[in-house]
């Protein structure tokens, strides 16, 4: 908790993903944070954090946004795409799943977080950021075991293809 307090106090822009895995299930909870500019979770992580299996993802994401006083909360939903809540825009932005071929989904949430944090931190709109981050995740699911990074030129080409 001491490290979290230091990060909260010193970070110019703070993006947080409290990833759930076999080594930390339930112990690295978003509720340990009192602020974040961006919280990025997948749907199971969201449901675990709120202890709620039944309410809508949007309702639970807003609950987390308020708990952590976050500017943005993004929820990746696998085959259901992604959503992002924006406090300042008072909107929910949605992106459909942008990949047609999934080889390995490990790392897709990390790719989403990386591009979402970078985009929002640079001042892009949450709508545009959700799309770009979803495109990065779509590329990532086509890479086995994060073998290769997502090259900027590959992301540009993929986005161009999606927009045609």
What function would you assign to each model-found segment?
Residues 71, 98-162:
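Conserved post-catalytic alpha-helical subdomain immediately downstream of the catalytic base
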Residues 89-101:
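Glycine/charged-rich beta-loop-alpha catalytic/anionic-binding loops adjacent to active sites
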Residues 77, 162-163:
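C-terminal catalytic "cap/lid" subdomain
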Residues 2-92:
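Conserved phosphate/ATP/ADP-binding segment of small-molecule kinases
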């Amino acid at each position: 908790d001491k490290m979290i307090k230091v990060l909260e106090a010193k970070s110019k822009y703070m993006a947080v993903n409290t990833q759930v895995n076999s080594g930390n299930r339930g112990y690295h909870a978003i509720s340990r944070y009192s602020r974040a500019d961006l919280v990025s979770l997948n749907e199971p992580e969201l449901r675990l954090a709120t202890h709620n299996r039944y309410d809508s993802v949007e309702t639970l994401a807003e609950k987390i946004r308020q708990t952590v006083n976050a500017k943005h909360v993004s929820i990746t939903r696998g085959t259901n795409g992604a959503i992002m809540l924006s406090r300042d825009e008072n909107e929910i932005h949605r992106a459909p799943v942008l990949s047609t071929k999934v080889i390995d989904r490990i790392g897709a949430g990390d790719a989403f977080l990386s591009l979402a944090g970078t985009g929002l931190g640079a001042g892009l709109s949450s709508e545009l950021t959700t799309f770009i981050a979803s495109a990065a995740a779509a590329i990532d699911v086509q890479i086995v075991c994060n073998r290769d990074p997502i090259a900027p030129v590959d992301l540009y080409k993929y986005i161009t293809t999606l927009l045609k």
